[in-house]
Design a protein with these regions (language model features):
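Structured catalytic cores of enzymes that bind and process phosphorylated ligands/cofactors
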Residues: 17, 56-62, 72, 89, ...
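Conserved short strand/loop->alpha-helix "switch" segment adjacent to the catalytic nucleotide/phosphoryl-transfer site
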Residues: 1-22
């Protein structure tokens, strides 16, 4: 698998990824009434991982324990089922509900540890393009972590150029305030077609989150029984910046999760229709939300990060 090779995976791990992808795709075909298999590489600092997500909108799995036993998902094939995938992968989980389909996720690590890869990220180009005009960044700088999602205007190479320029600028100024980061990014994007971008900065000592955004990259903080939308300002980085970029600071409540997404997902994103999903791994949350809220007509990025442990 080319993605695993590009990430520097060993030959053995590349083989494991290939087996897992085949098993997951077969499971969708046999039981999911069609669906998608997403291959999502992610990066945090020098560490990288590869997520496989099998998404379907089929009848759901009534007995998840049985489904995870060897052979259940691929009876009649040469495969060994979801249980075998779970043993090959470094981490895995499943979410299923009656008449709402199933999302199965597994993760393969190149380096680092599971704790450093608690975030779930999906970043996909529109089908007609080979590159995404969206991007993201996660950077840890001393006592804080910066999460960023950017959406270059339009799609294709021009949008990608704007998004990657934003990534480089945010990484360069990651130790500054969110307002300063936005101002620097605006200046650097003047040579591009522009972008929308939102930042969330977690202060690990103060246990606070500072949020700032320009344009239509949406952010929210969810917790069991609660959800709060994060405020962004109108404008376009590189073209039209508000005179004073605003920062919004709030304390991080227990069991909170940050969700950020581009307008490739519709604005109705939420977890209320999925009992128990808030307590599942972040990549699984990202997979469910992408499946059910992606517009499928634009580049799409969603970042899900549990804040307990990151703060």
């Amino acid at each position: 698998m080319s993605e695993a090779l590009a990430l520097g995976f060993s030959e053995e791990k590349r083989s494991d990824v290939g087996i897992a992808a085949t098993e997951a795709a077969t499971n969708i075909f046999l039981h999911g009434r069609g669906g998608e298999l997403l291959i999502c590489p992610s990066k945090a600092g020098e560490d990288v991982c590869l997520d496989l997500m099998a998404l379907d909108s089929g009848p759901g799995i009534s007995d998840i324990t049985r489904a995870m036993q060897d052979g259940f998902s691929t009876i009649g094939t040469a495969g060994q089922g979801l249980g075998a995938i779970g043993r090959l992968a470094d981490d895995s989980s499943i979410f299923s509900a009656p008449d709402k389909g199933t999302v199965y996720w597994c993760r393969f690590l190149s380096s680092g540890s599971r704790e450093r890869f608690r975030t779930g990220i999906i970043n996909l180009a529109i089908k007609e393009e080979t590159v995404s005009g969206d991007s993201y960044l996660i950077v840890r700088h001393e006592a804080r972590t910066v999460f960023m999602v950017v959406d270059g205007l339009g799609h294709g190479a021009g949008a990608t150029e704007a998004a990657q320029e934003a990534v480089k600028t945010v990484e360069r100024y990651a130790n500054r305030s969110s307002a300063e980061i936005i101002e620097h990014t605006h200046d650097e994007l003047k040579k591009t077609r522009g972008a929308a971008m939102s930042l969330a900065i977690v202060d690990h000592n103060q246990k606070t989150l500072t949020y700032a955004g320009i344009g239509n990259v949406t952010g929210m903080i969810v917790a069991p029984g609660a959800s709060k939308s994060l405020i962004t300002q109108n404008g376009t980085l590189g073209a039209a910046l508000p005179r004073s970029p605003q920062e919004f600071v709030q304390a991080i409540a227990p069991s909170s999760t940050l969700i950020m997404f581009s307008d490739g997902l519709n604005s109705r994103v939420g977890l209320t229709a999925y009992p128990g999903l808030i307590n599942r791994p972040a990549p699984l949350i990202a997979g469910v939300l992408y499946r059910d809220f992606s517009r499928r007509r634009d580049d799409a990025t969603i970042l899900v990060a549990p804040l307990e442990g990151n703060a």
